[in-house]
Amino acid sequence: MRKLLYRTLALSYGAYFNSTALFSEKEAGKRAFKTFTTPRKGRILPVHQEYLQEYLGKKILVNNTGLQTYEWPGTGETVLLMHGWESNAFRWRYLIEKLQEREFNIVAFDAPGHGYSEGNRLNVVTYADSARQLIDLYRPKHIIGHSMGGLATLHNQYQNPNTSIEKIVTLGAPAELSELMAHYQNLVRFNNKVLEALDKHVYEHFNYRVHDISTPKFAKSIAQQGLIIHDEWDTITPFNASERLHQNWKNSSLIKTTGLGHSLHQEEINLQIVDFLSS
């Protein structure tokens, strides 16, 4: 019943966008983009509060949006953690334990519209810009990004090459924004006029076309050591996204897991990440 209601709601959005496009394609693109970039969850829940409250850092203003940071001080190199869509810094708790055992200095933050951070929406470009400013502030040696966090990390490194960063880890990261948009179109069932209007909206506001956001494209110019981890049965982001990324990332290694899902927070994964950063 719940799936049926969700499907019905999704189709109603598509019908709404299609009807809007009959009168204004520009408005249809704007509304489709707003829906695509509005998270339904990812805020701090009571189960998250006790853990995160202890490690609250300062709130950083990025593009007029306050971003909540968290800090786990250590004597070693600094690691920046970037969570995925509809998540928050709590998702890193198991990895943080392993990083602390090796004395890494750990920084995380909640993306716009997520966790304790301000805002209501998030897209790859604004997330990458958030990463850039956090990198300038904390000067991490290593960055770990899960899902959308991995995509934003690579986008930022491509757009703003930073030689102080030595290693990058991506977990279940998507390859192409165009593929995410195609999935969105298939789910909601809006027509190609709306899709074209959405692409125009992205270009007008962020100076990018949808097809420009591509991790295989970004990887060609990234010199940092990379560790790419992806589960072959991932139902959120297909494994071949990381295969294509690895193919174009000269200095990367690809770990294929089986049956660990999209979240990839199991101990065996965390140990492989920590070993990679420590080597």
What residue spans do the PLM features occupy?
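An N-terminal hydrophobic leader/cap segment in hydrolases
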Residues: 2-59
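Conserved alpha/beta-hydrolase
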Residues: 89, 96-118
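Alpha/beta-hydrolase active-site loop
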Residues: 121-141
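Gly/Ala-rich beta-loop-alpha elbow adjacent to hydrolase catalytic centers
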Residues: 145-153
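Hydrolase active-site cap/lid region
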Residues: 162-208
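Short beta-strand/loop motif that positions the catalytic acidic residue
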Residues: 221-223, 228-230, 234
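Conserved alpha/beta-hydrolase "acid-adjacent" motif
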Residues: 235-241
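Catalytic histidine-centered segment of alpha/beta-hydrolase-like enzymes
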Residues: 260-269
